Amino acid sequence: MTASHHSKGRRHGHSRHGHGRTKSVLWRINWLFIILAAVASGLVAYFLLTYKILAGRGYHLWVLGGLGAVLLLLILLNGLKRLGKTTLVLATVVILGASYGAYQMNATVNFFNKLNTNTQKQELTMSLATLAEGGVADVSALDGKVVLAPLGQDRENVQALVDDLKAKRQVRVTVEEVPSYLAAYQQLLDGKAQAMVLNSGYESLLEGMASDFSSKIKKLYQYNHVTEVAAQPAKPEAANQQTSQTPAENQPFNLYISGIDTFGPVSSVSRSDVNVIATINPKTHQILLTTTPRDAYVPIADGGADQKDKLTHAGIYGVEASMHTLARLYDTPIDYYVRLNFTSFLNIIDTVGGIDVYNDQAFTSLYGKYDFPVGELHLNADQALGFVRERYSLSGGDNDRGKNHEKVITALIKKLGSRQTLLQAQEVMDRMSQSVQTNLPLAKVMELVNEQLESGQAYTVTSVALTGHGSTGLPSYAMPGAELYMMQVDETSLAERQAQIKQVLGQ
């Protein structure tokens, strides 16, 4: 055998050994990727099983079965070393796909956790205010002086401000009681005191009585008063009581939808201008939206001391007060709530690309000066805000505004459930988490989604409204002495609304 033959033999030997080492390295890499794919699949399994995601029709089991089959295939393929590259590509696809799925499910869980955490906070700003012209220059000038405040209405918050002022600025003030914040403002204008206490929740009420209120005063000191709340389901038999009982799985329930009158954080205490009870029956696929006009003259629970006032004023005592007030009015439990502010409309409606509503009367809105003709309308966020705020240009006034609230809510619900919106779910959730509060848990949402997957039946949405007749001069607990427009509830209309709610609940 020649030297050249020996040389070729050695080269072929080295080639076989080199190729074998390459396969061995690829085999080890594949095992690493298979393990990573198993971990990612395990995360998917955790979210699917823990939160019952896609449990309708057992879709979650199909997903888990598919992932399990692919993992088994990867193990078998890796045993066939000739298919090492195919194994690597498939394992990479599983890692990326499962990781993305786990990420999206984790984002959804965090989204609801954030919304539910938002419900635990309620904030308002307590201020010491003086006249913009001729008032004191600095809060230190009030040391030892008298300030005006409605202790009978708001003692706890007023005292919190006084204590904070004393602790942080060493300024001690004496509080002189007046009947209301409106009375305090009037006496401030009359020069009977140098300063008044002001609760931010009442500012919009004062602006409604005196359009130049904000320009007439200046704030010397502000204290952001944050309280912890935990709104539980409201019982109808006692407006100021709660129950920890929540509806059983797939049972009908009531959801209170509140739209607050502010552009600030959703946790801000404010009047509730939108008051809708959504009665949802997952078995019959019915949703009944019952609107109660903001001016409805009803007994206000909790901070309202069960005295009659405008429904909108319940919001200044917190979302629980509104829930309890409506639960007693309609003689029905209210299990959950969603609270959003007008900033929410601006954020969410633009995020989903606008909404479509049918307008049954032409009008021009005071806000934005938008012209709304009769017929189908496509609204962006700002147009929708003008659409839901307007009442003076509508033939039915506040009743018609309530109907427009329902139209926008219904249109938004439909848009949020569309395929296009689902594709941008992350952006929608990011926007909503900044401007929505709810105690509706993820588990209840998954119940509804899974039931919908099981049946495939669309929901029938019906809108109704409580009616009454207008009246001026009725006493207001929040604004004693003020001449306010109220809507005295029509008892026949109330009985009809109560019966409709009970019918959808299956009672």
Regions of interest found by a model, annotated:
Residues 1-40:
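Membrane-anchoring/interfacial helices and their immediately flanking loops
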Residues 23-34, 75-91:
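N-terminal Sec-pathway targeting helices
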Residues 27-76:
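Membrane-embedded alpha-helical segments of integral membrane proteins
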Residues 83-106:
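Internal/C-terminal transmembrane anchor helices
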Residues 90-97, 137-140, 279-280:
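A short, flexible N-terminal coil/short beta segment enriched in small residues
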Residues 101-118:
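Hydrophobic alpha-helical transmembrane segments in integral membrane proteins
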Residues 113-121, 131-132, 138-139, 146-153, ...:
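Non-catalytic, solvent-exposed segments at the cell envelope interface
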